[in-house]
Amino acid sequence: MSRVAICPGSFDPVTVGHLDVITRAANMFDKVIVVVMTNSSKSPSFSAEERMSMITKACEGLDNVYVDCYEGLLAEYAAMRDAGAIVKGLRAMSDFEYEFQMALTNKKLNPNVETVFLTTKAENMYLSSSMVKEIARMGGDIREFVPDVIHNEIINRLQKERN
């Protein structure tokens, strides 16, 4: 099995929950590629480049973590990068049902890739990028939900949307 793993997501924006999963994956694999998946049917608050920049800042010090962006099938991306694993964080059973279906699909499309599920820490079970954005837009404090190094960047963008 390849010791390369992919941590895919929209990361709009990256949260401490995402960072926890990325850090744990970095301890399990030789190389972890955090891939910002783009979807033309969605309207993210941050551009793909901004999300990549925030992830890079948040992952500073994790020497085996790399950041990339991709629009297309995750199974194809895994094959292009010779990744043997897709790492996904799970918050609740509702996450599992969707992610299990995606794991089976990715395995069908790329038999060389396995999906590894990491359960989130209890303190992050409720945390989502959508929740962080809503709190920030309403002027709430998001410090405990996002990495310190990108806090101001997120606040500045989302509070501008509010005004």
Regions found by a protein language model. Give the residues of each.
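Nucleotidyltransferase catalytic core that binds NTPs
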Residues: 1-163
